[in-house]
């Protein structure tokens, strides 16, 4: 399973570890993914989403129904 947020689309980024001596080695910055279950009142069922902490705050702000409607408009299957 890919490390991608289902709501925001955030993916791993690449960058450098930088030591005190300014030596650089490649590394990956991974998104803060969480697996959460949400109750969809309109469909009377649970859905499971793999999303970032930023997406959780978006759901708190806008509501799960609005976020799911946006995902479906993008063509994602829920």
Swiss-Prot record:
Keywords: Ribonucleoprotein, Ribosomal protein. It comes from the Bacteria. GO terms for biological process: translation. GO terms for cellular component: cytosolic large ribosomal subunit. Residues 1-25 are annotated as: Disordered. GO terms for molecular function: structural constituent of ribosome. NCBIfam families: L28. This is Large ribosomal subunit protein bL28. It comes from Nitrosomonas eutropha (strain DSM 101675 / C91 / Nm57). The lineage of its organism: Bacteria, Pseudomonadati, Pseudomonadota, Betaproteobacteria, Nitrosomonadales. The gene is rpmB.
């Amino acid at each position: 399973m890919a490390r991608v947020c289902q709501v925001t689309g955030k993916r791993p980024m690449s960058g450098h570890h930088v030591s005190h001596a300014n030596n650089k080695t490649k590394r990956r910055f991974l998104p803060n993914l969480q697996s959460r279950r949400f109750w969809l009142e309109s469909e009377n069922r649970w859905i499971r989403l793999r999303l970032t902490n930023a997406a959780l705050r978006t759901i708190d702000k806008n509501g799960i129904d609005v976020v799911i409607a946006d995902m479906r408009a993008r063509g994602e299957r829920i």
